[in-house]
């Protein structure tokens, strides 16, 4: 490929540490360098990459070029209007360190703060508040994009001439162009603490009923589910940002209600035995985690990191799955197919697939993104070791049940669904392709994910 940028060949994987492929990684510092690269790129040869936190391979391009956008990391807070302008390579971690002390919070945050702005838009990430406030793209005001010809576009959701391209880009997994900058709305806060209600449930039925009942009462809601427990017991945590009166009542050790200091507690070792996570160890962990949670507690004040990003407390926690790596199976189905939550957990138990991180959330209304994942209903995410015998066959069977119910899988977590499953479960695919073809007529952008899904 002709490029004015030095390139370094690297082996890349997603966060699941599976399906490594080699690509030439380039790290531009200016827009014109990206534009030059795109103008001279052959078809199906380029994809962008942030911090590599997608679990599968959407930020890989075997034998092609991967654009590392880490140098596009500027952050500009507009306190008067409550908005943020940021480069696509700016991480949510870096943004939080700027906005929380200033009295603002992200409109949506996924389960890790080590995601870039570009990645959050490309995957249209969701959080614990989707049932109330939608996904990240719902709060984006503008996106600056370089298309497949290297031309710059300013995309906004409400402009009739750019709206379709905007929504194709949000959730489009980097396949409509290179996101270089975005402006999005923030939410005001008066403290950096979360007022949290916690409740334990001994079975899945009552847990899910409580989640439905709380849809209108809590801004944030998430449940941890014991995947190895037959009735599906779990711990439900719900809450909202604490106000100043609540902060004063807790006799805080800090004099600053907006104090924010996220810290990693340790680092997982680089080499762990492949059998460390098994049914026995996960069962023991799940028992301890369930018993550790209070039966019922209201109004506990928690810091941002333990509530929103608990796994960020251990650097490189993905290493605990050993050299074979892991995958996350995350689906969404309508409320009418809520029984698939239990059926999925049962199928994983049957083949002995241990998941110590199994998360259940509620989704609200979908947005206009044709490839955006959320839709009204239930979303279950289960992390499982990739080497479990029979796992792929079981997931193929679950795929069909999800598709039959009108559901779909999350592209940012996917590492194995078929092209047929994808086409069947994303009804907006053809509309997305039309917008993609307008922005990238030579089909310069491609990833290992898009190759597998034949898009």
Model region roles, listed by residue range:
Residues 1-455:
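Noncatalytic alpha-helical scaffold of FAD-dependent oxidoreductases
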